[in-house]
C-alpha cells in the first residue's frame, strides 16, 4: 500500500512533465481525485460497506496549516480490514459542503509548499501541533485520523500519547479541545494612512485596522442553573414579614382576580443573616373611592338615592356612602374653592369604575371615578417610593401568578404598614442584556442571532459601591441549517477568557434558553441600551412568532397569553407592561434625559464618557447594525470576537448607567414624588410632579382632580412640526442681542431657580388665586387671600394650613437642598459626598419641574392663569434688572438677556477683581427688592462672540473667584455643536472660533480666516488631505424611512437602501451619509459611507461641501466682526455667493425656504428653492409646455463629454423638446404674467407669514436663475457663455443691441430681458416689510 504523499507526488510529477499544474484541473476533476486518493488501499468490496449504516460526520474542526519549509514524513502502516471499511464509509458520507471546503483547502497551499516534492494532505485534516522542528517525529496518517474521528478513540494509543502536547485529537462526544498560547505569535497591528487614492476618489483612504479583542476583566465561571432555580424554599408562612417594595401592578376588574394589587420586591427571610428573596405580595379587597358634590338645594337622601340607582345600573352591588367635608381648589367649573360637604362612595375594586357621564339631577360633579386602584392605594397608604413595609397576616399563594421565588396573599390593605427605620435597602440583582438581531432573508422581520447577559449581584441601589460583573451568558445560533456553528466554540471562547457561551441550532432554541436563563437568574433590574423600543419589542415579536412558552420572564408576571398587537409591532405601553416586576433601566432614554450629547449611540456615549468595558478595544462589530454573514460564523476565530463585543456592549450599558448614577438618582426622585420607580425610569417627569402634589393635597383633605385624556390621534411628528404647537400665553423675555465680538470681560448674572422662586415670592397657588373658566390673566394674590374662611372664623393666623400649598412644597425642597449643600462642604468621604450630590440633584430637578405642572396642558394640575402670572412676573423681574444696571454704573451695558439671565459688558479688560466686585454690587442691589428671588453671579467671560438670540461662543473664566487665569470655551446654539454638519465643518469652525476668541484684537482675525479658509478649500479640492470620515453628515430618523414624503430627506433615502441590504434601521437612529458628485437632487446624491468605500465610481461632491458645509458656518461666525465682507470669504474659497441683505440675516433664525439661499451654485437651484415654482412656457413651434432653465442648459452644455464647448454665438433660450429658439419678448411676457399671478395669490391668502416666505422664495429663485453672470466666482466659461456667446441683446439703457454693437460699445453691458423682469419684481417685495424702529427717528 502506498501512502497519500507518494500518490500526490507522482501525480504532480506527471503534471509537470505535461507542462501544467495540478491546480489547473477543474473542480470536478479535483473532487474525483480526492475521492480516489481517499479510497487507496481499501477493498473494492461494496458488500462489506453496505452491511453497516453510513456514518455521517456532522461537523469537523478544520484549521489552517502552519507554513513550514520542511516535509512531514508519513509512515506506512498496514490498515486492518475494519478501518478500510470505515475509510470507505467516511468517503461516501462526505457532504457536498464538506467536500467543497476540503477542495478550498486543497487549493490554498502556500507557495513554499508548492515547490516541495512531498506534500502531506493530512495536514488539512489535523491540528497545527503535528509539525515538529526536525520533521522526524511520530506522525499520524490520514486514514488513522479519519478512523479515530469515526470511532471516537485513537487509532494508535502509543502515538497519541506521544503527540499529546502537539496534536490534540477531537472526540465528537465530549468536544474537548486544546489550544496553544497565542500570546507569543501576537501580531503588531498596522495603522497606516494611505496618501494614494483609489481610482476616482477625491479623499484620503484610510486603511481600516481591525484590532484583536482581548478580555481585560476577569469573568467568573458560570454556575450551574440549579443554583439559580426559582423554588420556594419556605416550609411555612410567617405571621408577618419585612418587605422592601419597588414596583406594583393593578389587576383590572376584567381579569380573574379583579380588585387586586400586586407588589413586587424583596422579602427578608432571616433578619439575622439579612437574607432576601424576590417576592410578590397580592393585596386583596382594595376599595375604590369616589367623591360627589351635591347640588345646592338637594337633600342627602336624594343624593344617596341617585347614587344607588347608578350603582345598581353598573352592577356595583356592595357599596357604602357617607358625607364628609373636603376642600377643593382646582379648575373644575362651578365648584367652589373652599371647604364643602361631599358624598364619599366606597365600594370594592372588583366592580367596574363608577360611570361619569354627567347630567345628574342631584349631583353637580363627580371626582375620582376614573382613578386607578394603584394610585389610590399609594396615596392612602402614603407610600413615598421604594421602602420597607411591615406586612401581617401573610398567606402562601398556591396559585402563583408571578416568577418570583416567593409569593404571598394579604387579605386587606390594612395589613400593610410603612416600616419607619433607617435600615439600608437590600442588595439588588442586575442583569444587563444585549441582543443582536438582523433582518431575515426576505428583509421583512428582525430575527435574533445572538444574546448576551451580564449579571451583577449585590448591587447597592443607593450608589454606595460600584459592583463588578458576577456572571456572563452568551447564546448564539446558526444563521441557517446549512451553516453550522463550529463545534469548539465554547472551548475556544473559554480559552479567550470568555465563559458562558452556548450554541443553538435555531432561533427558537436560542430564545427558549434566553427566557429560561432570565427566569433562573431572576434579576430585579434589567439594563439595556434602547431596551424599550427595540430590545423588548424584538423579543416580544420573536417570542410570539415562535410561540415561546416562558416569554413572560422578561418581567415577573407569569402570563401565558400574548398581548394583542395592532400591526406588526408592539407599542411602548405593551412593552412596559411585559416588564412589570423588574425595573427597566434604558440607558438610551436616561442619557437623553440627564446627559447632553449629539450622539446617543452606546459606543459613542461610552467614548464620550471615557468608559471601558471588558475588552481593550471596540472591534468592528456593532450589535443591531452590523449584518452577520455565514462566513463570519464558520470559525471560532471569527465568531469569538463578535460574541465578545456583544457581551462587551452589555457591560458598557451597565457602566453608562453607573456613570450617570441613574439608579440612585431615579430612586431619590421617586422618594420625593411618591410615584412608581418604574415610571420615573421611563422619564415620566410630569407624573412625578403630579404624585408629589397628590400626596400634599390629600394629606390636607383636598379632593384632587382626575387625569385628563390625551389626544391619542396626535402621533410622532418631525421636529419641525413641534414648533407649530404655539403656547397659549407669553413665555420668558428674550432681549435683542447686541451682536459682535467683545474683548472686555462679560458678566453673566442669573436668577437662581427663577420660576420656583417667583411662586414662593408671590404666593402663587391654586388656593390663593381667584379665577374662573374665563380668566386669562391672573393677578398677584392680596394678603387677605392667604387664609381660608374656616381658619379665619377659627381665628388662626395667616397664611393658614390650607393656603399656599404649592409655595410650601417648593420651599421644603429648596430648604432641603440648601441643607444638603451645607453638609457637602464639610463632608470628606467620597462615597458619602457622591450620595449627597445625588440627593441635592434630585431636589433641584424636582423643584425646577414644579412650574411645568401649571403650564402643561395635559397635566391634571394644569392652570393657565397661574402659569401666565409666573412668566409675567419673570419678565418684570428681568426688565427691572436691566433698567437698574445702568443706574449702578453708566459705563456698563446689557448686551443680551434670556428669561432668567443677563449678560453685562463691563468695559474692564484686565482686572478680574473689579469685575467680581461689580457683580457683587449688582447682585446686592437687585436682591434688596425680593425675599425669595435671588440674583447671583453665574459666570464671567473673558471674550465673547455674540451672534444672535441663543447663539454665542465665549471664553469662560473658570476661576473667576480667584486669579482668573483658567479659561474654558463655552458654545451655545452654533452650527458646530449640531450633528447635521460634517466633522470637517465642525473642525474648521472650531479652528476659526478658537482664533477669534483668543485674539487680542481684531486686526489679524480676518486675515487669518481668509488665508485659512483658502488653504482648506485647496486641500478639499486636492483630495489628498481629508479622509472620507470628515465628510460624513449624520441625521436622526424621527419616523420610519417609508413615512418620509417629498424631497429634502437624504438620510431617509439612505436608510431605505440600508433596509434593502438587511441592515438594522430603527426610529431614532443616526443615519450617516456623504454627498457625492452628480447632477441629481441632493436626495439622489446621498450615499452611506460604506457605499462610498465599496464603490470606485463615487466621489465626494467637494463643491457642494465647500458652499453648503464650510462657507455658511464660517461666514456666520465672522459676519459681526468689524471689516468682514462675505465676498472676501467666497472669493478666497472660489465659490459662488449671493449678497445677503440685513433683513436676510435677521430672519435666518426662522426655518424657511430662504434661510439657506445665500449661497448659489451655477446649477441645481431646485435644491436651494425646493418649494419654488419653475418657469414653464408653451413652445411657439412644437406647442409643448417646456421649462425655462438657463442654468441647467448651459451647465449641461459644458459638462457634456460627447460634445465640445460652444465657440460660436448660440441661442440661450431654446425648447428642450424641438431645440428651436424661443422669442425673448414672448418669454418676458410669460414671466410677467406668472409673477402677477403669484402676487395676486399672495394678496388673496391674507399676507400671513407663510405666504410672505413663499413669495420671497419664489422671486429670489427667479432672480438667481437669471443672475448668474453677476454672481461672484462664476466659472469663466459659464460667464462667457451667458454674456457673450448667447444672444442677450438688451442693453442697460433699455435699447436693443446686436452682438456686434456690443463689441463696438464696450461700456454697454448686455442685459437679459428676463433678468430685468426678475429684478423689477424682486424689488417690489421690499414693500412687504416696513422697518418700524426707524419710522419716528428725527434727523
UniProtKB/Swiss-Prot annotation:
GO cellular component: alpha DNA polymerase:primase complex
SUPFAM superfamilies: DNA/RNA polymerases (SSF56672), Ribonuclease H-like (SSF53098)
Source taxon at top rank: Eukaryota
Motif (CysB motif): 1244-1274
GO biological process: lagging strand elongation; leading strand elongation; mitotic DNA replication initiation
InterPro entries linked to this entry: DNA-dir_DNA_pol_B, DNA-dir_DNA_pol_B_CS, DNA-dir_DNA_pol_B_exonuc, DNA-dir_DNA_pol_B_multi_dom, DNA/RNA_pol_sf, DNA_pol_B_thumb, DNA_pol_palm_dom_sf, POLBc_alpha
Subcellular location: Nucleus
Record key words, sorted: DNA replication, DNA-binding, DNA-directed DNA polymerase, Metal-binding, Nucleotidyltransferase, Nucleus, Transferase, Zinc, Zinc-finger
Residue numbers binding Zn(2+) 2: 1235, 1244, 1274, 1289
Role summary: Polymerase alpha in a complex with DNA primase is a replicative polymerase.
NCBIfam families, per the entry: pol2
Record-stated family: Belongs to the DNA polymerase type-B family.
Protein known as: DNA polymerase alpha catalytic subunit
Biological source species: Trypanosoma brucei brucei
Upper taxonomic lineage: Eukaryota, Discoba, Euglenozoa, Kinetoplastea, Metakinetoplastina
Amino acid at each position: 500500500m502506498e501512502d497519500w504523499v507518494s500518490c500526490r507526488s507522482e501525480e504532480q510529477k506527471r503534471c509537470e512533465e505535461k507542462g501544467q499544474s495540478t491546480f489547473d484541473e477543474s473542480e470536478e476533476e479535483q473532487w474525483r481525485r480526492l475521492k480516489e486518493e481517499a479510497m487507496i488501499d481499501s477493498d473494492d468490496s461494496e458488500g462489506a460497506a453496505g452491511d453497516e449504516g453510513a456514518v455521517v460526520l456532522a461537523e469537523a474542526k478544520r484549521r489552517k496549516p502552519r507554513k513550514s519549509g520542511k516535509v512531514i514524513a508519513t509512515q506506512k502502516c498496514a490498515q486492518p480490514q475494519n478501518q478500510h471499511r470505515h475509510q470507505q464509509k467516511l468517503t461516501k458520507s462526505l457532504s457536498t459542503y464538506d467536500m467543497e471546503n476540503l477542495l478550498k483547502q486543497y487549493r490554498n497551499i502556500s507557495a513554499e509548499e508548492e515547490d516541495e516534492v512531498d506534500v502531506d494532505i493530512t495536514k488539512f485534516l489535523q491540528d497545527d501541533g503535528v509539525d515538529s522542528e526536525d520533521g522526524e517525529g511520530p506522525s499520524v496518517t490520514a486514514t488513522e485520523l479519519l478512523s479515530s474521528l469515526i470511532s471516537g478513540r485513537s487509532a494508535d494509543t502509543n502515538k497519541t500519547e506521544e503527540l499529546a502536547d502537539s496534536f490534540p485529537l477531537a472526540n465528537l462526544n465530549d468536544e474537548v479541545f486544546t489550544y496553544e498560547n497565542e500570546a507569543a505569535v501576537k501580531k503588531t497591528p498596522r495603522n497606516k494612512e494611505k496618501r494614494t487614492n483609489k481610482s476616482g476618489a477625491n479623499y484620503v483612504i484610510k486603511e481600516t485596522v481591525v484590532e484583536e479583542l482581548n478580555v481585560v476583566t476577569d469573568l467568573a465561571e458560570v454556575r450551574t442553573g440549579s443554583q439559580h432555580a426559582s423554588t420556594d424554599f419556605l416550609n411555612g408562612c410567617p405571621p408577618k414579614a419585612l418587605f422592601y417594595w419597588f414596583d406594583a401592578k393593578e389587576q383590572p376588574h376584567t381579569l380573574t382576580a379583579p380588585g387586586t394589587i400586586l407588589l413586587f420586591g424583596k422579602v427578608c427571610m432571616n433578619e439575622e443573616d439579612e437574607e432576601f428573596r424576590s417576592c410578590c405580595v397580592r393585596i386583596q379587597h382594595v376599595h375604590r373611592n369616589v367623591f360627589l358634590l351635591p347640588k345646592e338645594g338637594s337633600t342627602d337622601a336624594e343624593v344617596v338615592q341617585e347614587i344607588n340607582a347608578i350603582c345598581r345600573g353598573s352592577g356595583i352591588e356592595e357599596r357604602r356612602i357617607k358625607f364628609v367635608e373636603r376642600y377643593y381648589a382646582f379648575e373644575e367649573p362651578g365648584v367652589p374653592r373652599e371647604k364643602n360637604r361631599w358624598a364619599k362612595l366606597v365600594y370594592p375594586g372588583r366592580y367596574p369604575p363608577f360611570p361619569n357621564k354627567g347630567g345628574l339631577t342631584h349631583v353637580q360633579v363627580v371626582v375620582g371615578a376614573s382613578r386607578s386602584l394603584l394610585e389610590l392605594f399609594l396615596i392612602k397608604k402614603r407610600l413615598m417610593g421604594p421602602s420597607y413595609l411591615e406586612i401581617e397576616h401573610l398567606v402562601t399563594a398556591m396559585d402563583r401568578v408571578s416568577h418570583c421565588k416567593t409569593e404571598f396573599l394579604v387579605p386587606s390593605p390594612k395589613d400593610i404598614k410603612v416600616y419607619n427605620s433607617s435600615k439600608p435597602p437590600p442588595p439588588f440583582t442586575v442583569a444587563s442584556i444585549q441582543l443582536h438581531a438582523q433582518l431575515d432573508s426576505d428583509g421583512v422581520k428582525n430575527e435574533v442571532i445572538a444574546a448576551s447577559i451580564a449579571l451583577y449581584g449585590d448591587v447597592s441601589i443607593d450608589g454606595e459601591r460600584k459592583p463588578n460583573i458576577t456572571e456572563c451568558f452568551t447564546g448564539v445560533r446558526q444563521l441557517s441549517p446549512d451553516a453550522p456553528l463550529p463545534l469548539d466554540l465554547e472551548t475556544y471562547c473559554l480559552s479567550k477568557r470568555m465563559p458562558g457561551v452556548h450554541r443553538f441550532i435555531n432561533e427558537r432554541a436560542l430564545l427558549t434558553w434566553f427566557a429560561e436563563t432570565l427566569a433562573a437568574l431572576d434579576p430585579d433590574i434589567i439594563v439595556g441600551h434602547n431596551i424599550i423600543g427595540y430590545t423588548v419589542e424584538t423579543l416580544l415579536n420573536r417570542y410570539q412568532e415562535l410561540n415561546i412558552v416562558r416569554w413572560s420572564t422578561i418581567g415577573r408576571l407569569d402570563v401565558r397569553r400574548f398581548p394583542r398587537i395592532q400591526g406588526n409591532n408592539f407599542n411602548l405601553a405593551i412593552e412596559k407592561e411585559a416588564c412589570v416586576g423588574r425595573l427597566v433601566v434604558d440607558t438610551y432614554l436616561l442619557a437623553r434625559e440627564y446627559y447632553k450629547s449629539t450622539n446617543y449611540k452606546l459606543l459613542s456615549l461610552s467614548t464620550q464618557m471615557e468608559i471601558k468595558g471588558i475588552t481593550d478595544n471596540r472591534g468592528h462589530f456593532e450589535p443591531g447594525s452590523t449584518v452577520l454573514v455565514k462566513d463570519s460564523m464558520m470559525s471560532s476565530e471569527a465568531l469569538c470576537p463578535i460574541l465578545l463585543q456583544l457581551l462587551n456592549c452589555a457591560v458598557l450599558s451597565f457602566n453608562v448607567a453607573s456613570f450617570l448614577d441613574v439608579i440612585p438618582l431615579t430612586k431619590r426622585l421617586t422618594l420625593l414624588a411618591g410615584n412608581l420607580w418604574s415610571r420615573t425610569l421611563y422619564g415620566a417627569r410630569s407624573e412625578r410632579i403630579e404624585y408629589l402634589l397628590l400626596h400634599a393635597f390629600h394629606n390636607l383633605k383636598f379632593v384632587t382632580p382626575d387625569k385628563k385624556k390625551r389626544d391619542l390621534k396626535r402621533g410622532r411628528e418631525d421636529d419641525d412640526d413641534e414648533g407649530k404647537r404655539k403656547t397659549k400665553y407669553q413665555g420668558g423675555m428674550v432681549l435683542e442681542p447686541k451682536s459682535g465680538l467683545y474683548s472686555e470681560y462679560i458678566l453673566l448674572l442669573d436668577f437662581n431657580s427663577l420660576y420656583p422662586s417667583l411662586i414662593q415670592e408671590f404666593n402663587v397657588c391654586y388656593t390663593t388665586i381667584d379665577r374662573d373658566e374665563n380668566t386669562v390673566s391672573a393677578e398677584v394674590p392680596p394678603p387677605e387671600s392667604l387664609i381660608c374662611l374656616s381658619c379665619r372664623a377659627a381665628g388662626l393666623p395667616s397664611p393658614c394650613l390650607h393656603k399656599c400649598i404649592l409655595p410650601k412644597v417648593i420651599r421644603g425642597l429648596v430648604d432641603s437642598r440648601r441643607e444638603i449643600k451645607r453638609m457637602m462642604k464639610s463632608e470628606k468621604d467620597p462615597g458619602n459626598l457622591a450620595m449627597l450630590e445625588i440627593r441635592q440633584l434630585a431636589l433641584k430637578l424636582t423643584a425646577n419641574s414644579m412650574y411645568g405642572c401649571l403650564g402643561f396642558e395635559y397635566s391634571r394640575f394644569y392652570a393657565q392663569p397661574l402659569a401666565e402670572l409666573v412668566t409675567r412676573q419673570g419678565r418684570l423681574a428681568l426688565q427691572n434688572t436691566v433698567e437698574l444696571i445702568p443706574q449702578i454704573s453708566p459705563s456698563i451695558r446689557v448686551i443680551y438677556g434670556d428669561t432668567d439671565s443677563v449678560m453685562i459688558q463691563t468695559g474692564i479688560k484686565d482686572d478680574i477683581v473689579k469685575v467680581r466686585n461689580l457683580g457683587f454690587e449688582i447682585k446686592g442691589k437687585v436682591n434688596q427688592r425680593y425675599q425669595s428671588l435671588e440674583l447671583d453671579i453665574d459666570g464671567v467671560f473673558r471674550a465673547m462672540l455674540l451672534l444672535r438670540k441663543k447663539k454665542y461662543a465665549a471664553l469662560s473664566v473658570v476661576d473667576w473667584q480667584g486669579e482668573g487665569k483658567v479659561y474654558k470655551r463655552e458654545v451655545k446654539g452654533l452650527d458646530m455643536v449640531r450633528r447635521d454638519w460634517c466633522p470637517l465643518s465642525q473642525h474648521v469652525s472650531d479652528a476659526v472660533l478658537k482664533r477669534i476668541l483668543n485674539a487680542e484684537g481684531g486686526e489679524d482675525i480676518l486675515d487669518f480666516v481668509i488665508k485659512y479658509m483658502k488653504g482648506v478649500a485647496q486641500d478639499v479640492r486636492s483630495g489628498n488631505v481629508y479622509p472620507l470620515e470628515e465628510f460624513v453628515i449624520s441625521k436622526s430618523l424621527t419616523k420610519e424611512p417609508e413615512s418620509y414624503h417629498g424631497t429634502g430627506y437624504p438620510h431617509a433615502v439612505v436608510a431605505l437602501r440600508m433596509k434593502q441590504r438587511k441592515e438594522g434601521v430603527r426610529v431614532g437612529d443616526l443615519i450617516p451619509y456623504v454627498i457625492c458628485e452628480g447632477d441629481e437632487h441632493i436626495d439622489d446624491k446621498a450615499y452611506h459611507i460604506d457605499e462610498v468605500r465599496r464603490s470606485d465610481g463615487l466621489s465626494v461632491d467637494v463643491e457642494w461641501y465647500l458652499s453648503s458645509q464650510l462657507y455658511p458656518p464660517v461666514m456666520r461666525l465672522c459676519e459681526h466682526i468689524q471689516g468682514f465682507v462675505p465676498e472676501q470669504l467666497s472669493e478666497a474659497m472660489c465659490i459662488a455667493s449671493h449678497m445677503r441683505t440685513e433683513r436676510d440675516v435677521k430672519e435666518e433664525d426662522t426655518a424657511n425656504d430662504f434661510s439657506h439661499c445665500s449661497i448659489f451654485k451655477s446649477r441645481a437651484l431646485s435644491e436651494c428653492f425646493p418649494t419654488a415654482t419653475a418657469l414653464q412656457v408653451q413652445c411657439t413651434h412644437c406647442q409643448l409646455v417646456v421649462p425655462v432653465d438657463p442654468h441647467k442648459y448651459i451647465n449641461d452644455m459644458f459638462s457634456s463629454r460627447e460634445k465640445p464647448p460652444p465657440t460660436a454665438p448660440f441661442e440661450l433660450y431654446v425648447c428642450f423638446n424641438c431645440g428651436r429658439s424661443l422669442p425673448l419678448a414672448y418669454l418676458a411676457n410669460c414671466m410677467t404674467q406668472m409673477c402677477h399671478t403669484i402676487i395676486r395669490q399672495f394678496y388673496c391668502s391674507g399676507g400671513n407669514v407663510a405666504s410672505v416666505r413663499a413669495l420671497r422664495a419664489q422671486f429670489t429663485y427667479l432672480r438667481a436663475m437669471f443672475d448668474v453672470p453677476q454672481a461672484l466666482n462664476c466659472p469663466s466659461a459659464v460667464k462667457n457663455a451667458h454674456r457673450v456667446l448667447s444672444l442677450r441683446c438688451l442693453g442697460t439703457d433699455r435699447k436693443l443691441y446686436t452682438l456686434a454693437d456690443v463689441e463696438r460699445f464696450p461700456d454697454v453691458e448686455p442685459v437679459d430681458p428676463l433678468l430685468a423682469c426678475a429684478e423689477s419684481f424682486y424689488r417690489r417685495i421690499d414693500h412687504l416689510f416696513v422697518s418700524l424702529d426707524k419710522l419716528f427717528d428725527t434727523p
